[in-house]
Amino acid sequence: MVARSTDSLDGPGEGSVQPLPTAGGPSVKGKPGKRLSAPRGPFPRLADCAHFHYENVDFGHIQLLLSPDREGPSLSGENELVFGVQVTCQGRSWPVLRSYDDFRSLDAHLHRCIFDRRFSCLPELPPPPEGARAAQMLVPLLLQYLETLSGLVDSNLNCGPVLTWMELDNHGRRLLLSEEASLNIPAVAAAHVIKRYTAQAPDELSFEVGDIVSVIDMPPTEDRSWWRGKRGFQVGFFPSECVELFTERPGPGLKADADGPPCGIPAPQGISSLTSAVPRPRGKLAGLLRTFMRSRPSRQRLRQRGILRQRVFGCDLGEHLSNSGQDVPQVLRCCSEFIEAHGVVDGIYRLSGVSSNIQRLRHEFDSERIPELSGPAFLQDIHSVSSLCKLYFRELPNPLLTYQLYGKFSEAMSVPGEEERLVRVHDVIQQLPPPHYRTLEYLLRHLARMARHSANTSMHARNLAIVWAPNLLRSMELESVGMGGAAAFREVRVQSVVVEFLLTHVDVLFSDTFTSAGLDPAGRCLLPRPKSLAGSCPSTRLLTLEEAQARTQGRLGTPTEPTTPKAPASPAERRKGERGEKQRKPGGSSWKTFFALGRGPSVPRKKPLPWLGGTRAPPQPSGSRPDTVTLRSAKSEESLSSQASGAGLQRLHRLRRPHSSSDAFPVGPAPAGSCESLSSSSSSESSSSESSSSSSESSAAGLGALSGSPSHRTSAWLDDGDELDFSPPRCLEGLRGLDFDPLTFRCSSPTPGDPAPPASPAPPAPASAFPPRVTPQAISPRGPTSPASPAALDISEPLAVSVPPAVLELLGAGGAPASATPTPALSPGRSLRPHLIPLLLRGAEAPLTDACQQEMCSKLRGAQGPLGPDMESPLPPPPLSLLRPGGAPPPPPKNPARLMALALAERAQQVAEQQSQQECGGTPPASQSPFHRSLSLEVGGEPLGTSGSGPPPNSLAHPGAWVPGPPPYLPRQQSDGSLLRSQRPMGTSRRGLRGPAQVSAQLRAGGGGRDAPEAAAQSPCSVPSQVPTPGFFSPAPRECLPPFLGVPKPGLYPLGPPSFQPSSPAPVWRSSLGPPAPLDRGENLYYEIGASEGSPYSGPTRSWSPFRSMPPDRLNASYGMLGQSPPLHRSPDFLLSYPPAPSCFPPDHLGYSAPQHPARRPTPPEPLYVNLALGPRGPSPASSSSSSPPAHPRSRSDPGPPVPRLPQKQRAPWGPRTPHRVPGPWGPPEPLLLYRAAPPAYGRGGELHRGSLYRNGGQRGEGAGPPPPYPTPSWSLHSEGQTRSYC
């Protein structure tokens, strides 16, 4: 039985040779019968191999993996870690064993000759760690290393040590270099095949008759069954009877064995006779010579062992630099320095030198000697040095730009665009081997320096590129097939273009700061370039947190609309715009969109309602969402001016406005620069605007009050149709992103001493649509005077309202009997003027939710409390307003019922204050211009049925002078309203009254705008243009105000002893700085009600007894009134100025003539702002007995002294009304009430005299007299993107 070895060529090759058993003496003469030890083979050890590079390689892709059949690294005999690596190339795979030091050697060779670490991204292998777990720590590192290397390895590997590490030759065949491999075992005999044999096992050899086999192992003579030998590169077993050994001295005619018996192969007779006749040379010298010639190593083997040194010219660049230890070739360094010093001559690198000088220089460099270039021979023949330099690069086996990167360079240059081409070429250069990269950089910088001397050498960059291109870049495919004709010219073109591009951009391509990060594999930029600050935003001011949140919320509302401002137009475009050309700016922003931001960039002007004489605009669908967004308060110059960049953007969906402590009343001075910044920003914006017909329209609608331009309508929002719009004013359209609140700014009442700029009778030019610059002192809350200035203008007239039944029940449920206390009058002697608030929303009739009822009841309970007669409420600060009637209203209401409750409570409070004012006998100050009023209350409530007793009232009413006492359940509401007015810190206002200078220009006729006829048609109240343009006034002390010009009113019913003191100290207002107030979950409701100022008529009287708890059942519960006595003194100027009567009142029906003053002109109506914000406050029954009402949860100041309570609600003395149906999503409006100026007269039983009440449209009640000659009050309601106007 013969043992077989598993050693074969396809095996690992590192196993030991299995010896065959020996039973006797040697079977071959002179050869022992034991196992032959494997001597040192012809291949050196891996560490002993000299560094060399193959000239040509073609093996394709190589895959390297840690051997999967090995569980982990093992320890070799030298106690070093050994890892198994599976190498796969050209479909064949074999394992190799390598230590960790071998891995580090491979990494060093790779990054010294093949790759740069910036391109390969391979980590440098650290020294081997110490400890027992070193193997487990190195396995993940080597796995990642081999995986990354497999993705990089291609036919670009020409380094001999690297391929030897993988047991590869330059053609992808396995190269066995192990010393103990069976292929390296020397043979003991040679034999030729005499019998054909086919292998029956993988470790057997197959051969044919006549093949030569080298025998490496033979058993004894007695056992001749199996021998082991080599045939070609295969090692295996074969039967011994199939071969015959060659003998050293064969016999004549036969080739016999040494033992005597012939092998049976006869020799030819002619050959044997010939060989026997020629004597063979014998001797030791002849044998040595024959042995040397047979075993002469090849050139490649001599290079591996370091015996043969490659010359400089024709040697691989990486090999030469590795053997010489230099960064760049010595030939290049010496030649470039010499040429830069002496070679600035005409035709350098283009002309050729003397051939003998070139060969002599080459021999010097090949002999590793540096020639003396400064000799006279070379100084006279400088072109020989330049020719030698080109010769060196031309004879490189692999050109400087390598064969492998020829196609990539060609593709990079075909990319369109200079910048992208630069990036692509830079990426290709990074793939060069480090020796090539360093040499290319050195050569290109040298050629770039020579190109700067093109005036002396006539060799600019293009000429140098044409001369050097064939020496630096070549294609292996074109050289192998032999190109000619068009292909040759095409290659020259590609070569010259690439080299010229490298010469032109050498400083950029080889810069350390140049990077292609952020680019995709194709070289396209993935990261957008940041725009310049001046081009991306108009202001360099940092945004506040609120502004950023508002902008973010606005962008979330419209994800499809870009909100990033575009870069401004170029200077040429701006110059074209100044010359009058229609230049479309990027982003669609222009000066006109600054006024129309809230209404959208393409929303046309809406037409008036049908009952105003116009055509109705198509109503908005009820299910549609308003295309607006809530704007927060703008509290500074920066916040006003920073939003001009948002003009022209798409409307954003309205979001929930965050509550703050500045929602209701101001208690501190407002920033002085607010209005000025707005005016200045508008003026600066107008410098680049273009004049068009729409400019006058925008200016008249948005800035008519400030600029004095003519107006086309009398009401602020009469031209909005029935589509409710709560966008900001047109002049403040740029403030959309700031959550702007129109009620923030207030202006103080005018002072008689302040001069008003007279208005020119001629209409202003349409182009001057921007307001004049306003000084901070003109809009200061307190004016330039001392703090003793009078209080802000306030509403103190009776109010007839229409309240839904649900609100009336809640108001009645929250009341309880309590003693009434007087309220100090804010303006002594002010005439009482009625204001009508019709309920215009159909949704107001809907029942309130439980949460709303609880809020209202709780606030009504918490606001009541006994007030002493000696206590007085602090005066509210003078308001400031930058709004005009032409501006857009505040955000849309969310709950009409809560709105009405707010308005009723505030009106009742003002009426009570007016009563106390008249009881004191004071004279109301005279106002010279109309003003706009703002109400902002927060009313809470409790569920129905939680109140004490008494039926719920139907409306909030103020008793007349004949009423002995107020109802017991109303003081709470008045207390609540006064409390809220007294707790607002200064500087935190979000509501504001409108000052005299903000009167809309549409209310002044006579002007020349193109909308003047339309304004006259839309507005029933037109005023002449001779009215002086009011300016910004500051309040003056009360004693400076002139008395009323009319008959004084009789005193109203006193709620208590008068406690008003004209010389009372000014209230102390706390700073707005402090802990933030808790946010209110209630919704804010805003209304503006514009009514004619100075109405000298009194409110309707009641036909029932003032002591009755409920009005008669025949009265409609949807209407309410506030009784008021006629004035006792002469009315002020602005109260005696009325516009002409509307067309709805025929002249023959006007039985009452209002007093007119010849020197006064009619004034526009004033809007009434109403804000309702209900907070989630629970009922507090104990608060009714407290001496001081509790502070509002959103207030940051002290509650202040107690305030009186509200008067009793009453019903209006008429029957059920017929609703006026109006198509639209919000339902029909309520009929309006008109009053006569005659004092109220009650008959027996409190019956109302006939002829004291009127309805709108000229409809009279039973026995009604003619309507008054003044126009009816005007209302305009904005909600959910729609607007309704009433007159």
From Swiss-Prot:
What the entry lists under InterPro entries is as follows: PX-Rho_GAP (IPR051576), PX_dom_sf (IPR036871), Rho_GTPase_activation_prot (IPR008936), RhoGAP_dom (IPR000198), SH3-like_dom_sf (IPR036028), SH3_domain (IPR001452)
Ranges where the record places region Disordered? 1-40, 551-792, 813-832, 859-1030, 1056-1075, 1090-1134, 1146-1287
In this chain, composition skew of type Low complexity spans 558-571, 672-709, 813-829, 896-919, 1175-1189
Q: Which residues carry this modification: Omega-N-methylarginine?
A: 1244
User: Which residues does the UniProt record annotate as the domain SH3?
Assistant: 186-248
Molecular function (GO) terms listed?
A: GTPase activator activity; phosphatidylinositol binding; protein kinase binding
**Domain of life where this protein originates:** Eukaryota
Q: SMART domains, per this entry? A: RhoGAP, SH3
Keyword tags: GTPase activation, Methylation, Phosphoprotein, Protein transport, SH3 domain, Transport
Where does the record place Basic and acidic residues bias?
572-584
Bias-annotated ranges (Pro residues): 752-766
GO biological process entries: protein transport; regulation of dendritic spine morphogenesis; regulation of postsynapse assembly; response to toxic substance; small GTPase-mediated signal transduction
One GO cellular component this record assigns the protein to is: cell cortex
The residue ranges flagged as biased composition, category Polar residues, are 622-645, 972-981, 1019-1028, 1274-1287
Say if the entry is tagged with keyword Coiled coil: no
Which residue range or ranges hold the Rho-GAP domain?
A: 315-510
Pfam families given in the database record: RhoGAP (PF00620), SH3_9 (PF14604)
> Which residue pairs form cystines in this protein?
none
Question: PTM Phosphoserine: at which residues?
Answer: 8, 570, 636, 727
According to the entry, every stretch annotated as the PX domain falls at 59-168
Residues annotated as site: Arginine finger:
350
| Positions of modified residues (Phosphotyrosine) | 1169
Subunit info here reads: Specifically interacts with CDC42 and RHOQ/TC10 through its Rho-GAP domain. Interacts with NEK6.
Role summary = May be involved in several stages of intracellular trafficking. Could play an important role in the regulation of glucose transport by insulin. May act as a downstream effector of RHOQ/TC10 in the regulation of insulin-stimulated glucose transport.
Listed name of the protein: Rho GTPase-activating protein 33
The record lists the lineage as: Eukaryota, Metazoa, Chordata, Craniata, Vertebrata
